[in-house]
Curated annotation (Swiss-Prot):
GO terms for cellular component: cytosol. The keyword Amino-acid biosynthesis applies. It comes from the Bacteria. Belongs to the TrpA family. It comes from Opitutus terrae (strain DSM 11246 / JCM 15787 / PB90-1). GO terms for molecular function: tryptophan synthase activity. Pfam families: Trp_syntA (PF00290). Its EC number is 4.2.1.20. The active site is at residues 49, 60. This is Tryptophan synthase alpha chain.
Length: 266
């Protein structure tokens, strides 16, 4: 059984949703990013979604765009992202899913990129701007190297589209709870229970919900119906608000992540 499947199975056995933390690799630099990953992992997160910094992150809101910019300005490269994963693997077996864009995968060479990710310790690949009907090469590379494919379902996705996405996915299905980009919002969408149920009609894979979830109460609401909850901007803000003090960054991340994890209990 894969690390991803084991993580969801453990959460289910504990009567809670899995908590998935998003951080941008290399934000604000390699060493602080590694410490940030350690802080959220030790706070009890079930999966780590690691954003691969990109100069044109179209699906990301301002918070995550700035995180990618900080990482790139610090000199973060694709090789450094793989190195970061290897360093995480020195102290944790938490599942790691790359959150990336197709240009980055293509520029490296699809098979070479997926192989390098697997060798570093990556468990899954979410290529945000790659629809399943255009993903044959990436999917084949993932199958060949034992990396699980994650796809996004949007609020506007019709049933036939959901069915196609469900057929292509192997790790979990990521439902984005609103149209547009990532970022903090005041309340979660009211249609999440219906959307999750609609996806489950097409797959037995775990269904996670992300985009805009930022506090413990919102986590609690989503955890009541979904298999997993993704929080990104609220964690990335812990870095942005404490730049210049790695100690404050890790302390704040540990506190915020721990509070959010507590909201996953059903």
């Amino acid at each position: 059984m894969s690390r991803i499947a084991q993580a969801f199975q453990r959460a289910q056995a504990q009567n809670r949703a899995a908590f998935i933390a998003y951080l941008c690799a290399g934000d604000p630099n390699f060493d602080t990013s590694l410490a940030a990953c350690r802080a959220v992992i030790t706070s009890g997160v079930d999966l780590l979604e690691l954003g691969v910094p990109f100069s044109d992150p179209l699906a990301d809101g301002l918070t995550n765009q700035l995180a990618a910019q900080r990482a790139l300005e610090s000199g973060m490269t694709a090789a450094d992202v793989f190195r970061l994963v290897r360093r995480i693997r020195e102290f944790s077996e938490v599942p790691i899913v790359f959150y990336t864009y197709y240009n980055l995968v293509f520029a490296h060479g699809i098979d070479a990129y997926v192989r390098a990710a697997k060798e570093a310790g990556v468990d899954g690949l979410l290529t945000l701007d790659l629809p399943p009907e255009e993903s044959d090469e990436v999917s084949a590379a993932c199958r060949a190297h034992g990396v699980q494919s994650v796809y996004i379902v949007a609020p506007t996705s019709p049933a036939e589209r959901i069915a196609k996405i469900a057929q292509a996915a192997t790790g979990f299905i990521y439902y984005v709870s609103r149209e547009g980009v990532t970022g903090v919002q005041e309340r979660v969408a009211a249609n999440i229970p219906e959307a999750v149920a609609a996806i489950r009609r097409h797959t037995a894979l775990p269904v996670v919900v992300g985009f805009g979830i930022s506090n413990r109460e919102q986590v609690r609401q989503v955890a009541a119906v979904a298999d997993g909850v993704v929080v990104g901007s609220a964690l990335v803000n812990c870095i942005r608000e404490n730049l210049g003090s790695p100690e404050r960054i890790t302390a704040k991340l540990a506190a915020v992540a721990g509070d959010l994890v507590a909201g996953t209990k059903r």
